[in-house]
Amino acid sequence: FTADKVQFDVDFVIHLAAIADVRRSLKEPELYWKTNVEYSKKIFDLCYKNNIPVVYASSSCVHAWWKSPYGTSKKAMEAIAHPGQIGLRFTTVFGEGARDTMLMSRIRNGTVKFATEHIRDLIFVEDIVSAIMIFVNTGTKNKNTTYEVGTGQGTKVSDIVKHAGYNVPTQEGQDAEADDNTANNSELRKLGWKPTLTAKEWIDIRIAVDYTNRLGEPK
């Protein structure tokens, strides 16, 4: 990323590019810093120079940023963002396109081997989109610098796994992972946003759809 001026007419920037995965960040901390922080700074500086508002993906990991290079990189992004650039602290996102290593992807793909007692606020990807669109439609002026984007309801990973019908052992989670990432979404709700689908509802829908599809398969 070497641009020092905007080549096109740009009204708004939605910056979601980053390397995710807390566990991987423990092995490649320099890559996470360069990609998530240094490259983001170029975007932030360029947009600020050209008066372009920005919404960017932060993370609930900032609440325990010291536990991992990933969390550190997201905390640093918030520190270097300029006025008019808003960080959305996503909790644990699920839905189409999620990484195969994510909990809900493992549930859908049948690759769950164990569960933990971590508490996760699982947020549907379409609810993430609706949160972003609030700022696209209303702008970033006179708003907070960060907002937490989650349902506001945390559930144990082991309970989610059981709800999906898996009987797997419970193990200790990694120290690098937050014990509880439940969001305080009160500020975002003041702007008219609210979540529409819980993780358990999504699981029930997937089970029903998969069952219906199996009924339609030739015998």
Predicted regions located by residue number:
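NAD(P)-dependent short-chain dehydrogenase/reductase
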Residues: P69-G71, K75, A79-V129, M133, ...
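C-terminal "lid/loop" region of Rossmann-like NAD(P)-dependent oxidoreductases
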Residues: N144-Y147, T155-N185
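Active-site segment of SDR-like NAD(P)-dependent oxidoreductases
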Residues: A20-R23, S59-K67, T91-F94
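Conserved Rossmann-fold NAD(P)-dependent oxidoreductase catalytic core, especially the SDR/UDP-sugar
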Residues: H15, E38-G71, I86
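A recurrent short beta-strand within the Rossmann-like NAD(P)-dependent oxidoreductase core
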Residues: T92-V93, K113, E117, I132, ...
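Amphipathic terminal alpha-helices
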Residues: T198-K219
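NAD(P)H-binding glycine-rich loop region in Rossmannoid oxidoreductase-like domains
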Residues: T2-T35, L46, A64
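Glycine-rich NAD(P)-binding loop of the Rossmann-fold in SDR/ketoreductase-type enzymes
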Residues: F12, L31-K42, S68, T72-S73, ...
